[in-house]
Amino acid sequence: MRLDGKTALITGSARGIGRAFAEAYVREGARVAIADINLEAARATAAEIGPAACAIALDVTDQASIDRCVAELLDRWGSIDILVNNAALFDLAPIVEITRESYDRLFAINVSGTLFMMQAVARAMIAGGRGGKIINMASQAGRRGEALVGVYCATKAAVISLTQSAGLNLIRHGINVNAIAPGVVDGEHWDGVDAKFADYENLPRGEKKRQVGAAVPFGRMGRAEDLTGMAIFLATPEADYIVAQTYNVDGGNWMS
């Protein structure tokens, strides 16, 4: 098992991609903290995964919550070897309809949350003297703008840039910082996304999802499980020489 004895903190992991990562890490021998703003859901997920998982409340927009989360896990495990910054928020609107509230909320979760989670965990990793792995969740939306998701695109571009800067800054401490950039990933959130696109683009419900999947060279939308291999690899010693990179895992979407 490639992560035997390691401890991992995954934000926003009560469901979706974060949960898939947690399950994969446990299969590889790690202990995993299911950190989520929805503590009840986190507890349910941890119970389903088994004794190698624990649940912890975390609001990445609240510095006190971040500090409590890290301190609690250090008390429980003694170290945090892997951080996955997965918590994120998606929204869409034309430029002329973007609200200050939505803008601030997306940047608070997607950018500030990523930065200050990196900071808190990196401090613990440096103090522990063992280095570690930090994996940020970027997106293809961070590589190119899209008409109705301008703010989300900007937040994910910021995550890519932060990954580069943090990677260069922290490698001297033995901390590798890299990112994964998924393309379109299917999941329960897509029902709401599809409905919003339908309203803005005057499409029947389900049509945007069909269009998006058909445009992927692989032939379908991604699934959370498609990303787990990269998430495992970047957490292993095999990735020690990889620094400040963002990896596309998108079924060829970026090249299409």
Swiss-Prot record:
Record protein name field:
Sorbitol dehydrogenase
Q: Which residues form the active site?
A: 152 (proton acceptor)
Instruction: Spell out the CDD domains in the cross-references.
Output: SDH_SDR_c
- Family annotation (PANTHER family): 3-OXOACYL-[ACYL-CARRIER-PROTEIN] REDUCTASE FABG (PTHR42760:SF115), SHORT-CHAIN DEHYDROGENASES/REDUCTASES FAMILY MEMBER (PTHR42760)
Job of this protein: Catalyzes the oxidation of D-sorbitol (D-glucitol) to D-fructose. Can also catalyze the oxidation of galactitol to D-tagatose and the oxidation of L-iditol, with lower efficiency.
Q: Source species, please?
A: Cereibacter sphaeroides
**Induction text:** Induced by growth on D-sorbitol.
Characterize the pH dependence: Optimum pH is 11 for substrate oxidation and 6.0-7.2 for sugar reduction.
Instruction: Name the reaction it catalyses.
Output: keto-D-fructose + NADH + H(+) = D-sorbitol + NAD(+); galactitol + NAD(+) = keto-D-tagatose + NADH + H(+); L-iditol + NAD(+) = keto-L-sorbose + NADH + H(+)
Which SUPFAM superfamilies does UniProt cross-reference here? Answer: NAD(P)-binding Rossmann-fold domains
Gene3D superfamilies for the chain: NAD(P)-binding Rossmann-like Domain
KW Oxidoreductase (keyword) present:
yes
Q: What is the lineage of its organism?
A: Bacteria, Pseudomonadati, Pseudomonadota, Alphaproteobacteria, Rhodobacterales
What GO terms are given for molecular function?
galactitol 2-dehydrogenase activity; L-iditol 2-dehydrogenase (NAD+) activity
